[in-house]
Amino acid sequence: MKIIITALLFAIVMPSFAQRENEHNKHDMEKMEQFLPSVTRSIGGSFQQFDGLNARVANLPQYEHLKDYTATLGLGWMKEKDRFISDMGITIGSSLSRHRDEKSSTIRYIGFNANAGYDVLKDERITLYPLVGIGFQAYQAIFYKDNSAVDFDDVLQSPAVENSIHPVKFNNGFWVYRAGLGLSFKSPKHPSSSIGLQAGYTGSFQKRAWRSRENQSLRNAPKDRISQFYVSLILTSKPWMMMKK
C-alpha cells in the first residue's frame, strides 16, 4: 500500500517539477538571446579595378590582365539592440578566372571588417539600416602563362626552365573604410531568422605598392588603392544552440 501511495505522489509531483524546469530553461534561453548575436552568412560580388598593376601587364603579351569583379562568400555575426546594429565578419573573394594550362589571371582576397548601423524603420518585420565601418583586406594577384609549348625534357633538365613556368604572384594589403545600406526581412513564422541585402562602397586610406609572393618590397612596384563596390545576399539566424526552445 505504501508503495502504491508513494508511486501516486511521485506521479503527481513530477509533472510539476518538469513544468518548472521547462519554464526555467525557457527563461534562461530568452535571457541568453538578449546577449548573443545572430549568425550571418552571405554570398555576393564586388567590383574593383587595379589600374596600376594592369597597366604594367598591358604591354606583356604573355600575361592576361586582372578581372574587375570577384565572387564573395562571408561569415560573421550581427547584433541589434535598441535599433542600433553592430556586425563583424570575414569575407573571401575570387574572380574565379584561373586556368592553369592557359594564359590567364586571377585576383583573390580575404577581408575582415567591423561595422555599426542604425535601424531607421520602426517595423518588426523590416529593417533598413545605413552602416559604416573599417576593416582590412589582403589581396593576391596571380598570372599564369601558356606553357603548352614547353618541352617536358627541358623542364626536367633545366632548373631555369622549370622556374620560368611557375605562375607569377603579387601580394598587397589595405586598411579600408566602408559605407553602405542594408535591408532585411523577417518571416512571421520564423522571427529569429531573416533574409536581406547589403550594398555599399569600400575604399582604402592610401595607395599601396604591390609586393612579391614572399611579401618583399620591390623597387618601382606599381601602386593601387581600393575603390570597391559590393553587394551581398545575407541570411541571418540565431546560434545553433538556440534553434530549439
Language-model features: locations:
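Residues that define the transmembrane beta-barrel architecture of outer-membrane proteins
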Residues: 37, 67-73, 106-112, 126, ...
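Membrane-embedded beta-strand positions of outer-membrane beta-barrel proteins
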Residues: 39-45, 86-88, 114-116, 130-132, ...
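Gram-negative (and chloroplast) outer-membrane scaffold detector with strong preference
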Residues: 82-160, 171-177, 187-189
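Outer-membrane beta-barrel domain signature
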Residues: 60-66, 101-105, 119, 166-172, ...
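Transmembrane beta-strands of outer-membrane beta-barrel pores
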Residues: 45-51, 81-83, 90-96, 134-140, ...
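Short glycine/proline- and aromatic-enriched beta-strand/turn motifs that initiate or cap beta-hairpins
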Residues: 19-82, 234-238, 245
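Predominantly the C-terminal beta-signal and adjacent terminal strand-loop region
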Residues: 174, 179-245
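Outer-membrane beta-barrel translocator domains and adjoining extracellular loop/strand segments
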Residues: 51-59, 97-105, 141-149, 207-216
